[in-house]
Amino acid sequence: MKRLILITDHYPYTRGELPFVQPELAVTCQHFEVSVICKSPAEKQEYPLPPGVKLYHYHKDATVGEKIRNLFGCLLDGNYYRSVFGKEHAKGSWRAREAEVRNFRLSAHLFRKYLRDEGFFDRIEHTIYYSYWYNYGAMALA
């Protein structure tokens, strides 16, 4: 059976993506082996999932070593410079942009490592990865 890996920011720990996810899960569960990976820092699950849906709760704070490695990685990454200084950069001071891009990159790297370590990249030819938002979860899949 094909797998669907759904990456959420809040659901089912808080309301978050509930209006988008709930109507779709009933149908997708009939055709896919569904897993939800929630990145919410909340501890208590507020909303039930349909039977058969596996839930994984991801929340990780970076260690000092990971932050330092990310800083050096940024210095060697052309996309980092384009995001901070390029024509399409976000508004605000360059320091604020730099911190946002650096943290986004670190979060994506740590989440990608989690996905790899937990086996979510096994059987990729039979897996669909889905994120509602363009955030570090989506970037981890890039």
Where does each model-flagged region fall?
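Short, flexible coil/linker elements and helix-boundary hinge sites characteristic
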Residues: 33, 85-86, 117-119
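A conserved catalytic-core segment of Leloir-type glycosyltransferases
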Residues: 43-106
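Amphipathic alpha-helical segments that form well-ordered structural scaffolds
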Residues: 27, 110-116, 140
